[in-house]
């Protein structure tokens, strides 16, 4: 089985355990050598003779799907599949899989690391220290502040849990909010505009569309 692998973190030389697992499954792997998501015209020549497709953030349009008669399955390396023309895949009988929640812990932790970096001005202070300066800056204390989480899915929930550990007040907006979960974890439900007005920190975990 020939498989196209396009996610940039799954390319040779990246030390990915997932790639080693994939190599054990197939010895005919095709890789993305451009180091970025592929366009339609870049994708078709690589994909047209493949049976499987482990997809990154490429543009998987009807044009791409129609050009690939050997394709039997598309598996998104991530939770979202908004870049896949689901209707076109369904019309050709090609199942589309994704991996919801697989990176939630890592992304949620990174989100909070970035919040700390901004609140405590870590990048600026690091640069100034390297330049021989000694800038005194207290930054912003997070305890008691309100974090507004837009999108309370798997990643948003990890971010909320981290924020609770810092004794922050957590509010959330989600068009498909789980009221029972929010009640259980003391998360205030807000409308979009209310969250923007009330939050000291905003974490965005929704598609930009």
Descriptions of predicted regions:
Residues 1-50:
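N-terminal glycine-/charge-rich "phosphate-binding" loop or analogous flexible N-terminal tail
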């Amino acid at each position: 089985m020939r498989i196209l692998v396009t996610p940039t973190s799954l390319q040779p030389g990246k030390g990915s355990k997932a790639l080693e697992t994939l190599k054990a499954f197939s010895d005919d792997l095709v890789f993305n050598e451009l180091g970025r998501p592929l366009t339609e015209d870049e994708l078709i020549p690589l994909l047209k003779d493949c049976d499987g497709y482990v997809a990154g953030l490429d543009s998987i349009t009807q044009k791409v799907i129609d050009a690939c008669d050997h394709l039997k399955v598309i598996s998104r390396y991530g939770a979202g599949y908004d870049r896949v023309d689901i209707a076109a895949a369904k019309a050709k009988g090609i199942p589309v899989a994704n991996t919801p929640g697989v990176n939630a812990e890592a992304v949620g932790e990174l989100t909070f690391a970035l919040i700390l970096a901004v609140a405590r001005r870590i990048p600026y202070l690091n640069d100034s220290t390297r330049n021989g300066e000694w800038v005194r800056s207290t930054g912003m204390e997070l305890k008691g502040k309100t974090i507004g989480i837009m999108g309370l899915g798997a990643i948003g929930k990890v971010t909320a849990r981290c924020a609770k550990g810092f004794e922050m007040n957590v509010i959330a907006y989600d068009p498909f909010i789980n009221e029972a979960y929010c009640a259980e974890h003391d998360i205030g439900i807000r409308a979009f505009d209310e969250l923007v007005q009330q939050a000291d920190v905003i974490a965005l975990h929704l598609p930009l569309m």
